[in-house]
Amino acid sequence: MKGVTIHNFCYSYFKVCLLVMSLAYGSAEWDGSSSQIAKTIIVNPNDARYFKTVQSAIDSIPLQNQDWIRILISNGIYSEKVTIPRGKGYIYMQGGGIEKTIIAYGDHQLTNTSATFTSYPSNIIITGITFKNKYNIASSSSPTKPAVAAMMLGDKYAIIDSSFDGFQDTLYDDYGRHYYKRCVISGGIDFIFGGAQSIFEGCTLKLRVGIYPPNEVYGTITAQGRDSPTDKGGFVFKDCTVMGSGKALLGRAWKSYSRVIFYRSMFSDNILPIGWDAWKAKGQEGHITFVEFGCTGVGADTSKRVPWLTKASEKDVLQFTNLTFIDEEGWLSRLPIKF
């Protein structure tokens, strides 16, 4: 039998450490393939060996990166605005869970500049992290303004077991194909908005209308921005739960061909009977696709919904609820995590 060399021992020890850390950081797991995860870097402000901020870890990744690099973010509250710039794709951000790893800031005023977290490139994975915009959450005295927690602008994103916390315009899901699974999204006004092509599966949508600030009469969950009949965008909510405080619409049309589908989801009594608003597409209701199919709960009664609510068969709906809506070429199955 060969002796154990220092090199072999160190390499084996490193692999064991990574495995232990992977199991400790969220429920999505690394599949163990060194060919898929090329490098792991760590953020821990309390250890001089590692990066002190999330942004400094991202800054260390070379432009035009083509290999998956994992950023393990230690538990804690990170008070910083974080941006993944163009040309820095294939980043896997892994936190310790939504109650443990929190990136929070309080910028506000404009949707395109206020985000706590902004991601431009394609090929991004996020697990076990809360992105929070603190503006208007802890104070009822501030005027309501756009205050984005996260702005997603790239293609092929998988966001698992994460949280987006804010009040107005919490999640700016604007471009690309995105898969959100077991996420929590909180807010009061248009708190999931944009033009992306996304499936939200097993997610919890938490309303905080009437609390911060108290003068809001009712809120809106979605404001989807599909703007033409050929636009592939749309928000699909599959097996989700809507709950929280106050009353809200399921959505309002931000653009003329807005598309939102709720499938097999549970609505609490927070949902207003009318359900939806044509908003920016008034007079063009025939272009809007707002669907509720197989939903349950007190708020799922559609007898008093808007008369132009889309009538869809199960066959019609399944073309959107199937993962092929965002994943015709199988990119999700090629990701270096299991979820």
UniProtKB/Swiss-Prot annotation:
Residue positions of the active site: 169 (proton donor), 190 (nucleophile)
Chain positions of site Transition state stabilizer: 168
A GO term from the CC aspect: extracellular region
Highest classification ranks of the organism: Eukaryota, Viridiplantae, Streptophyta, Embryophyta, Tracheophyta
Annotated positions binding substrate: 116, 252, 254
Gene: PME10
GO biological process terms held by the UniProt record: cell wall modification; pectin catabolic process
Alphabetic keyword roster: Aspartyl esterase, Cell wall, Cell wall biogenesis/degradation, Glycoprotein, Hydrolase, Secreted, Signal
Reactions catalysed, as given in the entry: [(1->4)-alpha-D-galacturonosyl methyl ester](n) + n H2O = [(1->4)-alpha-D-galacturonosyl](n) + n methanol + n H(+)
Protein name, UniProt field: Putative pectinesterase 10
Entry EC no(s): 3.1.1.11
Record-level Gene Ontology MF annotations: pectinesterase activity
Protein location: Secreted, Cell wall
Signal peptide: 1-28
Pathway where this protein functions: Glycan metabolism; pectin degradation; 2-dehydro-3-deoxy-D-gluconate from pectin: step 1/5
Tissue expression as described in the entry: Expressed in siliques.
Glycosylation: residue positions: 112, 322
Entry's family note: Belongs to the pectinesterase family.
Known role: Acts in the modification of cell walls via demethylesterification of cell wall pectin.
SUPFAM superfamilies on file: Pectin lyase-like
